[in-house]
């Protein structure tokens, strides 16, 4: 994904494609995918099937993002489906593998899978806010990356749905990739002072609350407490 968006920084370090080039980055991803498939084969058909279906969702989500919402479809609804497929699916699968290999009851495995999906979505929505609100030395990546690529995010979609005439110029700037660096900085300042940032944070907290509620069927334990704490860590992070 770093290669896809041509990001120079990820989590405070050089991205693989910047450090080693596109070819090595792609081949490394292929190797890791092959290695994980080999390891999962030892866990049986169900584990392999879960990986395949997760990868299917990831690819479908990427296709949906590239195509954009259908005519008449709510762009925000479309975006949240993309996020669920691209990010939620990965964390859901990780959580489900934990339940499967630990021998947890089926209902417990289903519960942590649902939690994983929701916390995965929350993680991406937090990234959307961080991309706008944080400085580079806080977030470990270049602020405004999505603006430069013209990729819709929670924050920009909240701006785009505004009917306030005062937002027209900003909406125009957000309607295409922004290549001029001075304009990127101008838009970042405008977004940081826009009500869409607070609205996006509220939506992020709603998803995190849904993740906590998903844990309701589980008994109180250190493990459940750790998952609750994960919700706080995801929404409070700056990188």
Predicted regions located by residue number:
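All-alpha prenyltransferase/terpene-synthase fold signal
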Residues: 1-239
